[in-house]
Amino acid sequence: NNRSQSMQTAHNHLIVDAYNANPTSMQAAINSFKGDTFILGAMRELGEYTHLEHQNIVNMLAERKADLVYLVGEEYRLTTSPYPIFDTVEDLHVFLQDNPLQDHYILLKGSRSTRMEKLLDIL
């Protein structure tokens, strides 16, 4: 159902929340997640706060010293992110085909419109 659920794939353990992402839920998920890998989609419908809120997420990840981060959505291009940014989930899917993740504990979260669940088959 894409709402916060834990799942084990053949290669990784995932926490999947591909239904809703707003600044509060994104920050809470990052703070409570005990894993090492983050795949985060854009937060949509933030209007004039889009840049600020996406930068806040990037800053949280940097402060946490996250091991591996992939960001999905053009909204992240406005930030000073040190992490790879993919404009679409399809772009990240292609990248992961050539750079598969193995034995990671992954938080997969993004707004419904980013369709983060499209990555499940490759994770």
PLM regions: where:
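ATP-dependent carboxylate-amine ligase
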Residues: 1-123
